[in-house]
Design a protein with these regions (language model features):
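Bacterial N-terminal signal peptides
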Residues: 7-17
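Bacterial N-terminal signal peptides that target proteins for export
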Residues: 1-6
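Active-site neighborhoods and metal-handling regions in enzymes and metal-associated proteins
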Residues: 21-538
Length: 538
């Protein structure tokens, strides 16, 4: 229902911005990005270079592309939000032919009046210097003449090239930048950057946390069939013996030393840096989370059984836009009834949610930083006896998970605490007969890092201060489950964004009601949308 309004409103906003000069002023500062690059250098090995490429432009259909989203690592280090760029960070200062010192180079897309008339203004070389504080900036077509001998470095570290990048005619684009880099770095045809990245995950994680890494590797192997033939990855992922994982770790370390091309160091450094947030980052992340919490509140007030999943999604996303969050951090999940049992349900096309529970997992992205907040509410405003029984188990599981989210605790501590509560609760209700069966109805992990990515980068080690994680237990009982039919179609997930501090966990999304009593009370509040009626269409 609200999508028509959003389309018109966004059209008006576009006209205003096209002719005006006002843009948001609360992005990360140039000093932030510069300081992050200095932190990168502190963690680099001697005589090394890190190479970061901008994200590719992605095609939606025919001649229409998706809205461009910068690679989070590239944005983190540069603040540059355009495509077709490459950043080089050197471990030590160098000199160019004019004797000028430098420790970083950035190549950006060239100013082009015709292209800018159609697609928006570009920073270009001078804008990148002025706005982002870089000194050594060049047009992308100059990268082919880069005065750097990659063979002279002990380590040339970069992320993989598995993204779909197109070769556009004319200007130097991402395709050309990557092609040039591969030629100059003697990139072998059989190099497996994703494999090297997973090797890095093995070697950079303390052996006592290797069980968690093994689980992650198992998921990667399922998603990347070309990696399934790698014996080191396969044995590590399938081993339950820490001694075996330690032996594989030593073998991986040997393999990593065979040439100067590497995907380990760059991955390890970015995992370390992005795991903990600076105060400047926390300002933006907190705003994204608060916006998302307000979205949940406004939907609670507006909810009624005749609403569609799409309409509910539209209310959330209108709130985001109203507060200046231009995008969502990930595809919005709005699942009524049995649809909520699909963990990543994004169709959101049920015409009426009826009297079911509605699971809403959404997050606003504010200036690159994304929230991830989930609430589950009864469409008719009142929890049934069965719905409340399941909800209360999940609520108490989340409380246990949040309480376990303290400095020094293992990354899996919230999940362990939450899982115990879920298992006991399901046993008490008679939904399961053995503790091991709880995994049937709670099949996912409880936490992930949060930041520039909804599943942000980190080391998966002990919790550190200024880390932001999610705590999101859930119970999902799809139709046809091996339990009493009265439980079928009930899906509950509660997800909050938690800041780890020396004084204990801080719930950044606490504004959105979590208890059944608080939710029901909020749903009785009037909504600005109560009197909003669109004309019917034939």
């Amino acid at each position: 229902m609200l999508k028509g309004i959003l389309t018109v409103a966004m059209g008006i906003l576009f006209v205003v911005q096209l002719h005006g000069q006002d843009t948001p002023t609360d992005y990360l500062s140039a000093d932030f990005h510069k300081e992050r690059r200095e932190k990168v250098r502190e963690l680099m090995s001697p005589n090394s270079v890190l190479v970061f490429f901008a994200n590719p432009e992605r095609n939606r259909a025919n001649d229409v592309d998706y809205i461009y989203h910068q690679d989070p690592d590239f944005y983190y280090l540069t603040g540059y939000r355009e495509p077709n760029a490459v950043l080089l960070v050197f471990s030590e200062s160098r000199q160019n032919t004019r004797g000028e010192p430098y420790n970083e180079l950035i190549y950006v897309q060239e100013r082009d009046a015709k292209a800018e008339q159609w697609d928006g203004k570009r920073l270009g070389v001078e804008g990148t210097k002025e706005k982002l504080g870089f000194k050594m900036v060049f047009n992308g077509d100059e990268f082919s003449a880069i005065p750097v001998d990659f063979s002279s470095f002990d380590t040339v570290s970069f992320f993989d090239f598995e993204n779909d990048y197109r070769d556009k005619p004319g200007e130097a684009d991402l395709f050309d930048l990557i092609k040039t880099f591969k030629q100059k770095a003697n990139y072998p045809a059989d190099y497996g950057a994703k494999k090297q990245e997973l090797y890095s995950m093995i070697t950079s994680t303390p052996i006592e946390n290797s069980a968690n890494v093994a689980q992650i590797l198992g998921r990667y192997l399922n998603n990347y069939p070309n990696l399934q033939g790698d014996e080191l990855l396969k044995v590590f992922a399938n081993s339950t013996d820490e001694a075996v994982r330690k032996e594989i770790r030593e073998k991986v370390l040997i393999v990593q030393k065979t040439n100067n091309l590497d995907s380990a160091m760059i991955s390890e450094i970015m995992n370390i840096l992005r795991e903990t947030k600076t105060e400047e980052e926390l300002v933006l992340l907190k705003k994204a989370i608060e916006i998302s919490a307000v979205g949940q509140i406004e939907v609670m007030k507006a909810m009624h059984p005749n609403m569609s999943e799409t309409e509910i999604q539209g209310v959330h996303e209108y709130v985001y836009k109203k507060y200046g969050a231009a995008h969502e951090g990930y595809p919005s999940i709005v699942g009524g009834g049995n649809n909520g049992c699909i963990l990543h349900y994004i169709e959101n096309n049920k015409p009426k949610v009826g009297n079911d529970l509605v699971l809403m997992d959404l997050g606003a992205e504010y200036h690159g930083y994304t929230a991830d907040v989930t609430r589950t509410i009864p469409a008719d405003g009142t929890f049934s006896k069965e719905q409340k029984a399941i909800y209360d188990i999940v609520y108490h599981a989340q409380e246990a998970g949040i309480a376990a989210s303290v400095v020094g605790a293992a990354f899996q501590a919230p999940g362990t605490a939450a899982s115990e509560v879920v298992a006991k609760g399901l046993l008490k209700l008679g939904i399961i007969k053995e503790v091991s069966e709880a995994r049937t109805y709670f099949p996912h992990g409880t936490s992930h890092y949060l930041g520039l990515d909804v599943h942000d980068k980190g080391t998966y080690g002990a919790f550190k201060p200024n880390t932001v994680i999610t705590v999101e237990p859930g119970i999902y009982i799809p139709e046809g489950s091996d339990c009493d039919k009265k439980w079928w179609g009930i899906a509950v997930r509660i997800e909050d964004d938690i800041l780890i501090t020396e004084k204990g966990p801080v719930n950044l999304s606490v504004m959105a009601p979590r208890t059944t009593e608080a939710i029901e009370a909020m749903m009785k509040q009037p909504s600005p949308l109560d009197d909003f009626v669109l004309p019917s269409l034939d």
